[in-house]
Amino acid sequence: MNIKPEEITSIIKSQIEGYESKLETVDSGTIIEIGDGIARIYGLQNCMAGELLEFPNDVYGMALNLEQDNVGCVLLGSEEGIKEGDIVKSTGKVVEVPVGEEMLGRVVNALGQPIDGKGPIKAEDSKPVDIKATGVIDRQSVNQPLQTGIKAIDSMIPIGKGQRELIIGDRQTGKTAIAIDTILNQKGKDVICIYVAIGQKQSTVAHIVNTFEEMGAMDYSIVVAATASDSAPLQYLAPYSGVTIAENFMFKGKDVLIVYDDLSKHAVAYRTMSLLLRRPPGREAYPGDVFYLHSRLLERAAKLSQKLGGGSITALPIIETLAGDVAGYIPTNVISITDGQIFLESELFYAGQRPAVNSGISVSRVGGSAQIKAMKKLSGTLRLELAQYRELAAFAQFGSDLDKESKKRLEKGKRLTEMMKQPQYKPMPVEKQIMILYAVVNEYVMDIDVSKLSAFESGLFEYVDAHYRDLGKQILEKKELTDDISSQLTKAINEYKKIFLAEEQ
């Protein structure tokens, strides 16, 4: 084999001609102060707001304060082994979270990393966590119902797809229970659910995940968890990560339900971060932009126009009040951002009225237009009747003689209140809600003892399933109480009532 020297020289010459000298410059700075998960860095002249910064030991931080001669940064990991004088590099990127179908059925942290021990997630894409909400032109008004499976809510405080409905109440009044029941009720309805746990105990999150797995809800759900043991920056990021994952599905034309549990702890995490960054405190020591913190998050829930696929994000933020004080700073902020609120009362809860929804203060500002006609017709006077009942019940405590009409109202009110009770993890399909509502509202159950009403309810459903099999299907298809459906319902209720009363004797 002959090797010609000319060939070798020509190859070397072409290599030399094609050589490009590449110098990679990285903007870097020096840590001048570190502690409590906050670092101050000197240098980083070209740093962006919210930029991801690379620290030693593979730890990343997020630049939040851009000051004249230094950058205030929150660490998204442990500060162990990082000290003053260490070099910090800018990455030119902002915080992103993985998105896509692969996230379904997984439990992830605020950065979208799996924490359920089921291996890595091969996500199709990643998106920045903090982006601008969809504009007004790209939205349409709320027009489809999102059934929670809870009688008190679906009848009096209806929620539509694309709505933001606040769940507010003291601790231990069943706020999370309502959110979980709503997620369980989406089974088979082609709605993707995202549960964001902020500042909760790990045991609580584990219990919720177990419930989802037992009930088969994990197939269409994603859990984003920033627990009490996580740092304030991760608790701050969690809801934004959750809604970014949700937006990816929404822009593909899908319906998403997202629960933020809860935004009170989110505001506290942001306050912690802001005070450590030495931002000036305002009312209750919260920073001045705490309203914007929640408004930019909740404005990302929307019902997209048909041109963009008609997808939606329905948000259920949760706020914890102290001793029923809805006039606090964070509660009033979130009430003014959302499209209505479900107010839970501890007095009702301890009196055995569960879910403990106070229908007098609770309201849904846009859900009424999404409610199905049958439910709208039945629940039209419900709120008023319950309010009148409460007023009468308070008056009747004084033992004064009541006229016949007032006694009748009291008896009907008792049955309406009893009918609204519902066990946890037992969401009810809308057609069954309509059946029992029809029976109580039209006074077919006045001769049934209040304590026997729940037994009558479950018996009625069994009777209808056995003898009027198509009735539920007809209600779902027609979505209104036609004369035919009404007469069938009346017949079924009266037939079963005879059997029920005969058995009771």
UniProtKB/Swiss-Prot annotation:
Catalytic activity from the UniProt record: ATP + H2O + 4 H(+)(in) = ADP + phosphate + 5 H(+)(out)
GO molecular function terms noted in the UniProt entry: ADP binding; ATP binding; proton-transporting ATP synthase activity, rotational mechanism
Topology in membrane: Peripheral membrane protein
Keywords recorded for this protein, A-Z: ATP synthesis, ATP-binding, Cell membrane, CF(1), Hydrogen ion transport, Ion transport, Membrane, Nucleotide-binding, Translocase, Transport
Residue positions binding ATP: G169, D170, R171, Q172, T173, G174, K175, T176
Top enzyme category: translocase
Site features described as Required for activity, chain residue numbers: S362
Major location category of this protein: membrane
Subcellular location(s) of the protein: Cell membrane
EC number(s) reported in the record: 7.1.2.2
Annotated GO CC locations: plasma membrane; proton-transporting ATP synthase complex
Family annotation (PROSITE patterns): ATPASE_ALPHA_BETA
HAMAP family xref list: ATP_synth_alpha_bact
Membership in a protein family: Belongs to the ATPase alpha/beta chains family.
Its job: Produces ATP from ADP in the presence of a proton gradient across the membrane. The alpha chain is a regulatory subunit.
Quaternary context: F-type ATPases have 2 components, CF(1) - the catalytic core - and CF(0) - the membrane proton channel. CF(1) has five subunits: alpha(3), beta(3), gamma(1), delta(1), epsilon(1). CF(0) has three main subunits: a(1), b(2) and c(9-12). The alpha and beta chains form an alternating ring which encloses part of the gamma chain. CF(1) is attached to CF(0) by a central stalk formed by the gamma and epsilon chains, while a peripheral stalk is formed by the delta and b chains.
Protein name: ATP synthase subunit alpha
Lineage, top ranks: Bacteria, Bacillati, Bacillota, Clostridia, Eubacteriales
Record gene name: atpA
